[in-house]
């Protein structure tokens, strides 16, 4: 698998993305938890913000939010294992390993604590991060993402919305479907009507690589094998949220109804839910100003350089 050179480089390119699209964003590659990860960076001063993408996207999903924040924040948009231009090894797509990847990336970047934002899969991962290492995060904004404390009575009626995941999660079939990118393109257009073809290509292009197609399949399969049973059998019931958190949801989100996100219980006492009228599944692209404003609410006035990472 080929990569640009080590260190800071010019814009990382995908089919459909021009080299002049985002001139203020630098790119680097770091080793975290034994995997080479790609990160896009912008801004030179202010509190640090870490952005985690959803599926089938990568760092580029945050481009408009980065533009909103870079003037007074240091912004880092990470390509998760298997996505974008990060390495795509044959294993490690369970939430526990992905959590370790991100924490190791923070260490490699020299960031003791950050404000975290995650979209969709990145939002689900974000909840695990703030539960696993709360002292590493000054605040968390989840975008178009479920939280771990969804009551069964609210979750079960929503399961039909995820019918398409059956095409992606099973070994062999999932990789085959993902490589052909048609379902991925449908997901992107379904979630954000009017998405330009060039942006669809930017996000689906990496999935044509066999290793990345398998990574996408494994991501969904590990959710079926681990996270869904954990939630079904009360694995999050005694995990208490101690980091200030805000969940943004769109009234037109095809994958997640805002009505299902309320009533998290006392475990999620610091979680607020904010519903954005008329918005769909890709808020970082549809309403970047609103997402950036939410991040600003939870970001400290000054970088939390003195924070001590949790073990």
Where do the PLM segments sit?
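A short, glycine- and basic residue-enriched loop/turn
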Residues: 58-59, 124, 279-280
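Conserved beta-strand termini and adjacent loop/short-helix elements that scaffold enzyme active sites
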Residues: 42, 276-278
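Alpha/beta-hydrolase-fold serine-hydrolase catalytic core, especially in secreted/extracellular enzymes
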Residues: 302-311
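Short strand-coil-strand connectors
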Residues: 31-33, 53
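Flexible "cap/lid" subdomain of the alpha/beta-hydrolase fold that forms the substrate-access gate
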Residues: 10, 14-16, 20-28, 35-37, ...
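Catalytic histidine-centered segment of alpha/beta-hydrolase-like enzymes
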Residues: 279-288, 292
